[in-house]
């Protein structure tokens, strides 16, 4: 586990974005942990979040020309990641996001920010069913741009209804790499380091055995 990944887990725990216990997911599965990125909801939270996204992007080595944040949750993520790349990595890159509803006056259209072109890095909080990614791909392809990759905060590394995860489906369908700041693997490694959190380790491991990819 890299230092920024450990720091991100601690940041998520401190904001109660990441919780351990027993939770029922939308899929009906009982999960021993829950991640709600919507609780990163202050200026300082967003500034820090952008630094973690930027770190993961630089670490990945993937080449891209523009950041795209799908409405709605992806919008602040793309914005803060663009700021962090410029301030901390000397990479001043354009960013763009979409509107859910096309504007009929003024500048018009359903895209805001830089022109959507070149190699696009899509940033979002998580991938659950991959629906938002598919909708974004239609927008990206309509502009003649290419998807360079997808970056999310957490990869749960678990199967969907079939034998592979929603993330693996996205990688298969669009031929792109999906990267994340952390995965279930790092969460387990973190729990293994923390004796005071040992009570959660067995249930998280059991969950991985049942649903892991």
Swiss-Prot record:
One of its GO terms (molecular function) is orotate phosphoribosyltransferase activity. It is an enzyme of class 2 (transferase). It catalyses: orotidine 5'-phosphate + diphosphate = orotate + 5-phospho-alpha-D-ribose 1-diphosphate. 5-phospho-alpha-D-ribose 1-diphosphate binds at residues 26, 72-73, 99-100, 103, 105, 124-132. Its EC number is 2.4.2.10. GO terms for biological process: 'de novo' pyrimidine nucleobase biosynthetic process; 'de novo' UMP biosynthetic process; pyrimidine ribonucleoside biosynthetic process. Its cofactor is Mg(2+). Orotate binds at residues 34-35, 128, 156. One of its GO terms (cellular component) is cytoplasm. SUPFAM superfamilies: PRTase-like (SSF53271). Pfam families: Pribosyltran. It comes from the Bacteria. Keywords: Glycosyltransferase, Magnesium, Pyrimidine biosynthesis, Transferase. Gene3D superfamilies: 3.40.50.2020. Pathway: Pyrimidine metabolism; UMP biosynthesis via de novo pathway; UMP from orotate: step 1/2. Catalyzes the transfer of a ribosyl phosphate group from 5-phosphoribose 1-diphosphate to orotate, leading to the formation of orotidine monophosphate (OMP). Homodimer. Belongs to the purine/pyrimidine phosphoribosyltransferase family. PyrE subfamily. This is Orotate phosphoribosyltransferase.
């Amino acid at each position: 586990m890299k230092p920024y990944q450990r720091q991100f887990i601690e940041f998520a725990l401190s904001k109660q974005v990441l919780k351990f216990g027993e939770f029922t997911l939308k899929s009906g599965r009982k999960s021993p942990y829950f991640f709600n990125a919507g609780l990163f909801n202050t200026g300082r939270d967003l500034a820090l979040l952008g630094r973690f996204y930027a770190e993961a992007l630089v670490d990945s080595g993937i080449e891209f020309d523009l950041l795209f944040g799908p409405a709605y949750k992806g919008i602040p993520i793309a914005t803060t990641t663009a700021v962090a790349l410029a301030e901390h990595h000397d990479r001043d890159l354009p960013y763009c996001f979409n509107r859910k509803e096309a504007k009929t006056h003024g500048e018009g259209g359903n895209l805001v920010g830089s022109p959507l072109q070149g190699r696009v890095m899509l940033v979002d909080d998580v991938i659950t069913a991959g629906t938002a990614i598919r909708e974004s791909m239609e927008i990206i392809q309509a502009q003649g741009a290419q998807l360079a990759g997808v970056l999310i905060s957490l990869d749960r590394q678990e199967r969907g209804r079939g034998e592979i995860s929603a993330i693996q489906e996205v990688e298969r369908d669009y031929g792109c790499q999906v990267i994340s700041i952390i995965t279930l693997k790092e969460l387990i490694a973190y729990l293994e380091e923390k004796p005071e959190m040992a009570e959660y380790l067995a249930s998280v491991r059991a969950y991985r055995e049942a649903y892991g990819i």
